Amino acid sequence: MTISLGFVVAEFNRDLTYQMELLGREHAEFLGATVKETILVPGVFDMPLAIKKLCQREDIDAVVTIGSVIEGETDHDQVVMQHAARKIMDLSLEFNKPVTLGIPGPGMTRMAAHERVDYAKRAVEAAVKLVRRL
């Protein structure tokens, strides 16, 4: 059985999320999974609707989220990450389908974000493992 993944990728910090997306695709192929569809959204906070659309599809086994939440002058990064992570988890439970978190942050500098692009690989691996085990 080939596992079909949907990717939801944030355009904000696209220099980072593009690298993450490429790593995620490469790792999916390595694991024998296929990325069936990728939806680009403006930012991490905008992911839930795209995740829901992919979760509703019969031909998608799991959804991988890819983004990067970098610290700013305010606590905005904390709020974005907290609410996004909660909604991502809620959607996974609502649709009984793995939705994995490939989003490093919050409280992270741009330099730290560059060092964490491998979170995309981890999210792909988690999605594939969950589909196989559940």
Curated annotation (Swiss-Prot):
It catalyses: (2S)-2-hydroxy-3-oxobutyl phosphate + 5-amino-6-(D-ribitylamino)uracil = 6,7-dimethyl-8-(1-D-ribityl)lumazine + phosphate + 2 H2O + H(+). Signal peptide: none annotated. GO terms for cellular component: riboflavin synthase complex. It holds the Pfam family DMRL_synthase. Its EC number is 2.5.1.78. (2S)-2-hydroxy-3-oxobutyl phosphate binds at residues 73-74, 116. 5-amino-6-(D-ribitylamino)uracil binds at residues 12, 44-46, 68-70, 101. Coiled coil: none annotated. Keywords: Riboflavin biosynthesis, Transferase. Pathway: Cofactor biosynthesis; riboflavin biosynthesis; riboflavin from 2-hydroxy-3-oxobutyl phosphate and 5-amino-6-(D-ribitylamino)uracil: step 1/2. Gene3D superfamilies: Lumazine/riboflavin synthase. The active site is at 76 (proton donor). One of its GO terms (biological process) is riboflavin biosynthetic process. It is an enzyme of class 2 (transferase). NCBIfam families: lumazine-synth. Belongs to the DMRL synthase family. Catalyzes the formation of 6,7-dimethyl-8-ribityllumazine by condensation of 5-amino-6-(D-ribitylamino)uracil with 3,4-dihydroxy-2-butanone 4-phosphate. This is the penultimate step in the biosynthesis of riboflavin. This is 6,7-dimethyl-8-ribityllumazine synthase. It comes from Methanosarcina mazei (strain ATCC BAA-159 / DSM 3647 / Goe1 / Go1 / JCM 11833 / OCM 88) (Methanosarcina frisia).
